[in-house]
Amino acid sequence: MASRWWRWRRGCSWKPAARSPGPGSPGRAGPLGPSAAAEVRAQVHRRKGLDLSQIPYINLVKHLTSACPNVCRISRFHHTTPDSKTHSGEKYTDPFKLGWRDLKGLYEDIRKELLISTSELKEMSEYYFDGKGKAFRPIIVALMARACNIHHNNSRHVQASQRAIALIAEMIHTASLVHDDVIDDASSRRGKHTVNKIWGEKKAVLAGDLILSAASIALARIGNTTVISILTQVIEDLVRGEFLQLGSKENENERFAHYLEKTFKKTASLIANSCKAVSVLGCPDPVVHEIAYQYGKNVGIAFQLIDDVLDFTSCSDQMGKPTSADLKLGLATGPVLFACQQFPEMNAMIMRRFSLPGDVDRARQYVLQSDGVQQTTYLAQQYCHEAIREISKLRPSPERDALIQLSEIVLTRDK
């Protein structure tokens, strides 16, 4: 079945999102635009003999996710996995240990960037830099830096500027979490109270701003205008993504496209552009820059899709934050949008943002009774397969294979 899936994938020119913007361009890349959707229809029509020209967006996505429903049965991989063979035949422990070699002292170095004289502001700004996070983004960035350097000139050395990108990515991500918690009025994250819960909303906004300013200073210190342009695009995307999340669409077809665009801007853009930034610093080849970007984008979208699945399938203790949180915020994520196809009565709840008493519980039950979780997981698998296809274009190395393994971990994580 797996080989059949790969034959189908190779024969399909579908790219789940638009190609990356060039240096300095506004970069309005978003997942699965109209031209890509049209190409998918044409490809599937040729291969299946079906007329898909009139299939609306969400049904097209659902058709693709159900085309090979049993693919990608990936065995679970944990950080404690013993040494194993990589795709290139070399041994390593696991991607996190491999990536962490270049990230020792990560959070200490971030705290040094936060040069603050006011003790309260310092405490707020350093609150999430306690070393207890997953450090998923810095790990990907460090591995991508080595993979690109090896591909370019067989150098296993990570430049100081590339390591700085890993720090900056984590700082931008953390600042966005602080601001998101204010907007969502969240009370817990990573198993502890949020900054806004402890210090209040006004001070939390300022703490997030301070982290962003420190990240901007660190970015300017690198001195590469192309890299600066790439990463400042991330900050714009974060803001635009939050605005997209605050809005909604009445049309079902527009609703799913809206959701995927929001997912790209709020989550995937940071990973994609951070990967691209380290590739620019380590290799002059634009083809490599595009590979790095596409890998990060596809893994980032898959990561958020699985996060949306876990909101329905994991308990609060596992997630470190309340489950069904998205429904309580009035958000219709992938599992909800797919479930709505089986239970059209959910449309009214989506439009009123689950605001009536009992809406959240009813919507959750509809999702669990439907194949919404399964279909969202299948869609995440497709994005991860695309990420693997992209990164496999680089020269074989332990770091490249670790990035392949990371894309598989994204699908099997439970928190």
UniProtKB/Swiss-Prot annotation:
Its EC number is 2.5.1.91. Belongs to the FPP/GGPP synthase family. It is found in: Mitochondrion. One of its GO terms (biological process) is isoprenoid biosynthetic process. Mg(2+) 1 binds at residues 180, 184. InterPro entries: Isoprenoid_synthase_dom_sf (IPR008949), Polyprenyl_synt (IPR000092), Polyprenyl_synt_CS (IPR033749). The lineage of its organism: Eukaryota, Metazoa, Chordata, Craniata, Vertebrata. Mg(2+) 2 binds at residues 180, 184. It comes from Homo sapiens. Pfam families: polyprenyl_synt (PF00348). Heterotetrameric enzyme that catalyzes the condensation of farnesyl diphosphate (FPP), which acts as a primer, and isopentenyl diphosphate (IPP) to produce prenyl diphosphates of varying chain lengths and participates in the determination of the side chain of ubiquinone. Supplies nona and decaprenyl diphosphate, the precursors for the side chain of the isoprenoid quinones ubiquinone-9 (Q9)and ubiquinone-10 (Q10) respectively. The enzyme adds isopentenyl diphosphate molecules sequentially to farnesyl diphosphate with trans stereochemistry. Pathway: Cofactor biosynthesis; ubiquinone biosynthesis. Isopentenyl diphosphate binds at residues 134, 137, 173, 190. It catalyses: 7 isopentenyl diphosphate + (2E,6E)-farnesyl diphosphate = all-trans-decaprenyl diphosphate + 7 diphosphate; 6 isopentenyl diphosphate + (2E,6E)-farnesyl diphosphate = all-trans-nonaprenyl diphosphate + 6 diphosphate. This is All trans-polyprenyl-diphosphate synthase PDSS1. Heterotetramer composed of 2 PDSS1/DPS1 and 2 PDSS2/DLP1 subunits. PROSITE patterns: POLYPRENYL_SYNTHASE_1 (PS00723), POLYPRENYL_SYNTHASE_2 (PS00444). Keywords: Disease variant, Isoprene biosynthesis, Lipid metabolism, Magnesium, Metal-binding, Mitochondrion, Primary mitochondrial disease, Transferase, Ubiquinone biosynthesis. Binds 2 Mg(2+) ions per subunit. It is linked to Coenzyme Q10 deficiency, primary, 2: An autosomal recessive multisystem disorder characterized by early-onset deafness, optic atrophy, mild intellectual disability, peripheral neuropathy, obesity, livedo reticularis, and cardiac valvulopathy. Its cofactor is Mg(2+). It comes from the Eukaryota. Residues 16-35 are annotated as: Disordered. One of its GO terms (molecular function) is metal ion binding.
